[in-house]
């Protein structure tokens, strides 16, 4: 299984934001220059091979990344684009002990979702991680 905590560590290792500024779940007091990693519940059927779930060799983890940066739109856009570019140019990937077959970016560029109530610019990147299932 590909866990959110492992994806959070992968995003942290990309060095766009400091490690303690990359989080999963909701934080009441988001720090500037942070990235949130959330499950993205977009519609998709489960991966099911003929013969049942145990015959499926891969699965999909849908993720939404929230880039919560600062009050400068240019700097915020630049940080979001830097993250997007690193994801787009990934050539080989293991997250934790899980081999990633490929990832699909679901948006053509980071999506500007405006500012939060404190005027901090935010961008969203939605993507799917296709990973090899490690069957016991």
Task: Tell where the protein language model's regions lie, with residue ranges.
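Small/polar-rich, solvent-exposed N-terminal microdomains that initiate assembly or binding
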Residues: 1-54, 90, 94
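Short, solvent-exposed beta-strand/turn "edge" segments of beta-rich domains on protein surfaces
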Residues: 52-57, 116-118
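Acidic-leaning, charged glycine-interspersed low-complexity segments
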Residues: 88-130
């Amino acid at each position: 299984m590909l866990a959110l905590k492992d994806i959070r560590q992968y995003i942290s290792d990309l060095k766009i934001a400091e490690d303690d500024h990359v989080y999963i779940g909701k934080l009441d007091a988001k720090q500037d220059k942070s990235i949130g990693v959330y499950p993205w519940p977009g519609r998709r059927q489960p991966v099911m091979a003929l013969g049942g779930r145990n015959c499926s060799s891969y699965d999909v983890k849908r993720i939404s990344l929230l880039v919560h940066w600062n009050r400068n739109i240019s700097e915020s856009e630049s940080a979001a684009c830097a993250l997007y570019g690193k994801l787009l140019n990934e050539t080989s990937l293991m997250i934790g002990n899980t081999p990633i077959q490929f990832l699909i970016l679901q948006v053509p560029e980071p999506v500007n979702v405006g500012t939060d109530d404190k005027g901090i610019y935010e961008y969203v990147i939605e993507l799917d991680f296709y990973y090899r299932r490690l069957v016991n």
